[in-house]
Each structure stands twice: as structure tokens, then as C-alpha cells.
């Protein structure tokens, strides 16, 4: 097949996305596919080119990525764009994707994951991997996610949505968790113990360009993630941070957390989380693949924290680790995601 892998973009998770895109591209090429790796934001900045040659050459906009403990410098990315515009889709992206059998979204956060890009591709009749615009929009907004989970009787921590720091000022439940409403990779998320720290955390959450934040009760317990591929849950993986909680730095720095899969849990606990993950996947109208995060307390209550419609595919990412336990190698997982995604177009 001819496949475009879209990565990069302008979200705070840009570097993670590029790392995912490079690995996905390499894996699909190993499987014999012709793959073009594009930065969704900068695109392919040439006025005259041969699309067929791009696929034959397995063109890639970069051959390296570095995921550090800080987020990407998006202003620098925008400054280096040839046309100097702020449009999300870079030059020639749509034209090249239109010449592919399918586009693999190796994007994380922002317009690549919030349903806007999915809706654009739907309108243009272009095939892509992952959830559609509805599921993407619901899962990207943590406030909407919480509302849908409550309506579908999926356990989730008690929380509220606030539109300004002033609105949040009356929150009295501590410890609590403060989250940007639409961020990913735990960027801007803080666990708060006191009212004074709460004010600072709220300001930080709003500093990421958010118009809403979610504040929820902190649930003490073990942290797990459950991948769902084709509607079926994979084995839960336990995340044990060496310090603090599972934030951006811990997620993408090798050795910052211990990740155990298969997890040291009972058959009952395994079933509780797999069932909740599949129920979340269905309630949020997710498709092809996703990852659902949980806190499991001492009473075996699995609290759903969020769903990720475009899980990371980096060397330290959770979904590939879970798939490996089921005997699904990395390249096979990439092909399975494409197979599951194509099925919705053949219905």
C-alpha cells in the first residue's frame, strides 16, 4: 500500500509525535509498504514535485527525533515555515494524502487529535487511522469525557469544569488534580495539596491556551493503562513512577518509571479494568484503537481518568508494550491499526 504518516504539528506533544511517526514509518516500510512521512504543519515545501516519486523514495521530512523533558518550541516551528502562515495543514499535505491508500495519524494533541483534522479528511473523502471526528472531539475534551462516562455509568473521579481562575477559586476538596481540558501527555497536570498551590496550578493550566480546565478529586491507588484495539482490551499495564506522578517527563524519559505488563493483578482486577476500558471505548464512539487510563483503588474500584484516541508509539509507549504481551509485534500492531481503520470504510 501507499501510506502517508502524518506527524509533528503545533501541539505541545510535537516531539513525541515525530518520534512516533519515525517508528511507524520504519515499521510499515519493513512490511513492504511505500511510506511518506510528512510534518502536518510544514508539509512538503516544493512547488513542483512528482508524488509517485515521493512514495517510491519513501520520503521522510526528518530522520531523527529527540523527546526531552521539556515541550517543543512551537514559536520556532512556526517561524521556520516557508509561507509564514499559521494554517494547520502545511503545503501539499492534502494533495499527497489524496494519493495514498490511507493516512496514518501519528499525531498527538491539538488539531491532530481533537476531531478537526478527522472532520477535514471526512469531508475530502480521505481515509485515515483511528477514531472519527466525534470520538476524537469527545475524548480530547476532558470535561466532555467525564460527562459521557458519568452518563454511561463508568466510574470516574468527581470533578468540575471551570472557565476562569476566578470560577475555580471556591474549590475546597484537597488533594485534587488540576488539568488543562484538552491537553495530552500530562502536560500542565498537577496534583495539589493546598489552597495556595491550587491557585498556582490553576494559573499554569490556563497558561497552555486553554479556555477551560478540569479540577477533580484525587484518587489514591495504582495507575494502569489499558489499550483497546478493534474494540478488544489488551492486558493492563501498571505504571510506577520513580518520583512524583506519571507526567510528561516521566512518560518519555527512559527509566523514569517502571512499567509492568502483564501487571501484578488478580484475574478479577484484570477483568474489571478490561471491561471498563471496552465500555469507555464504546461510550466515547472510539474506533480502531485507543488507550484508556485508570486508577485502581484498594477496593478494586477502577476510576477512568481519560481516553487517548492517538496513543503514543514511541519506544517507551504503553500500547506497544501491551500488544507485545499478546504476541503482537510493533510492525504487526501498525498494520493491525491500518486494517482496523480500513474496515470502517468497507462497511
Spans of features found by a protein language model:
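Conserved metal-phosphate-binding beta-hairpin within the catalytic cores
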Residues: 217, 226-228, 281-313, 323
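ATP-binding N-terminal substructure of ATP-dependent carboxylate-amine bond-forming enzymes
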Residues: 1-134, 138-140, 144, 163-168, ...
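Glycine-rich phosphate/pyrophosphate-binding beta-alpha loops
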Residues: 109, 186, 242, 308-322
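Hydrophobic beta-strand scaffold residues
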Residues: 35, 127-128, 156, 176, ...
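Active-site "cap" helix and flanking loop/linker of ATP-utilizing ligase/carboxylase catalytic domains
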Residues: 238-290, 321-347
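Phosphate-binding site of ATP-dependent enzymes
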Residues: 193-275, 296-303
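Active-site nucleotide/adenylate-binding loops and adjacent lid/helix of ATP-dependent enzymes
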Residues: 3-7, 11, 15, 19-22, ...
Amino acid at each position: 500500500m501507499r501510506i502517508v504518516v502524518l506527524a509533528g504539528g503545533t501541539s505541545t506533544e510535537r516531539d513525541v509525535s515525530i518520534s512516533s511517526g519515525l517508528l511507524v514509518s520504519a515499521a510499515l516500510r519493513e512490511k513492504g509498504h511505500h511510506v511518506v512521512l510528512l510534518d502536518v504543519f510544514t508539509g512538503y515545501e516544493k512547488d513542483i514535485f512528482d508524488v509517485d516519486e515521493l512514495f517510491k523514495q519513501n520520503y521522510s521530512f526528518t530522520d531523527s527525533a529527540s523527546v526531552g523533558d521539556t515541550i517543543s518550541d512551537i514559536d520556532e516551528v512556526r517561524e521556520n515555515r516557508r509561507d509564514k502562515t499559521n494554517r494547520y495543514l502545511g503545503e501539499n499535505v492534502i494533495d499527497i494524502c489524496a494519493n495514498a491508500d490511507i493516512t496514518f495519524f501519528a499525531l498527538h494533541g491539538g488539531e491532530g487529535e481533537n476531531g478537526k483534522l478527522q472532520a477535514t479528511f471526512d469531508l475530502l473523502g480521505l481515509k485515515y487511522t483511528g477514531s472519527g471526528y466525534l470520538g476524537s472531539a469527545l475524548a480530547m475534551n476532558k470535561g466532555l469525557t467525564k460527562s459521557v462516562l458519568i452518563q454511561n455509568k463508568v466510574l470516574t473521579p468527581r470533578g468540575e469544569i471551570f472557565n476562569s481562575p476566578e470560577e475555580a477559586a471556591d474549590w475546597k476538596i484537597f488533594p485534587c488534580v488540576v488539568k488543562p481540558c484538552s491537553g495530552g501527555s500530562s502536560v500542565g497536570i498537577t496534583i495539589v495539596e493546598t489552597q495556595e498551590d491550587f491557585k498556582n496550578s490553576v494559573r499554569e493550566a490556563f497558561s497552555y491556551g486553554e479556555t477551560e480546565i478540569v479540577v477533580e478529586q484525587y484518587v489514591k491507588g495504582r495507575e494502569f493503562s489499558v489499550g483497546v484495539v478493534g474494540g478488544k482490551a489488551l492486558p493492563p499495564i501498571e505504571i510506577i513512577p520513580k518520583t512524583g506522578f506519571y507526567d510528561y517527563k516521566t512518560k518519555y524519559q527512559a527509566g523514569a518509571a517502571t512499567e509492568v505488563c502483564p501487571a501484578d493483578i488478580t484475574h478479577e482486577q484484570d477483568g474489571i479494568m478490561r471491561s471498563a476500558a471496552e465500555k469507555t471505548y464504546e461510550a466515547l464512539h472510539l474506533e480502531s484503537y485507543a488507550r484508556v487510563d485508570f486508577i485502581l483503588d484498594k477496593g478494586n474500584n477502577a476510576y477512568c481518568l481519560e481516553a487517548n484516541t492517538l496513543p503514543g508509539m514511541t519506544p517507551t509507549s504503553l500500547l506497544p508494550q501491551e500488544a507485545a504481551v499478546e504476541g503482537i509485534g510493533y510492525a504487526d500492531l501498525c498494520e493491525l491499526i491500518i486494517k482496523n481503520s480500513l474496515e470502517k470504510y468497507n462497511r
